[in-house]
C-alpha cells in the first residue's frame, strides 16, 4: 500500500482543510461564529488525520475502523458547513464548494469501506 498522501480521498480531505481555514478566518468575531469555527476546523482536520492513521494499519479491521471515524468527521463537517449556511455567516458560494468536495470524500470513504468489508468477508 503506497503512501497515504497518494490516496485521492486524503488529497480531497486536505483541500477541505485548506478551504475551511480560509473560511473561518473570514467569519465574524461573534461568540457563535467562533465556536462554529473551532468545531468546523476540528472536524475537518480529523478527516485526513484518521485516513492517515488508518492507512498505517493496512487493510485490516483497524483500517476500516479509522475510515469509519473519518466518515463520521466528514459528516460532522457537513453539519457545520450547513449550519453556517443556515444562519448566513458566510457567502453561499464559498460554503457550497466545500460541501461538494466533502460530499465527494464521503462517497469515496463509503465505497472504500464497503470494498474493504467485502474483501474481509
Task: Indicate where each model-derived feature is located.
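Amphipathic alpha-helical assembly/interaction segments
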Residues: 1-121
Amino acid at each position: 500500500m503506497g503512501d497515504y498522501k497518494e490516496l485521492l480521498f486524503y488529497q480531497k480531505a486536505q483541500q477541505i482543510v485548506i478551504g475551511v481555514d480560509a473560511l473561518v478566518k473570514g467569519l465574524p468575531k461573534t461568540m457563535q461564529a467562533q465556536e462554529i469555527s473551532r468545531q468546523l476546523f476540528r472536524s475537518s482536520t480529523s478527516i485526513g488525520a484518521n485516513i492517515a492513521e488508518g492507512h498505517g494499519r493496512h487493510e485490516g479491521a483497524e483500517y476500516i475502523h479509522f475510515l469509519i471515524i473519518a466518515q463520521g468527521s466528514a459528516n460532522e463537517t457537513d453539519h457545520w458547513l450547513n449550519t453556517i449556511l443556515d444562519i448566513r455567516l458566510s457567502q453561499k458560494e464559498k460554503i457550497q464548494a466545500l460541501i461538494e468536495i466533502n460530499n465527494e470524500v464521503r462517497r469515496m470513504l463509503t465505497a472504500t469501506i464497503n470494498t474493504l468489508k467485502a474483501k474481509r468477508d
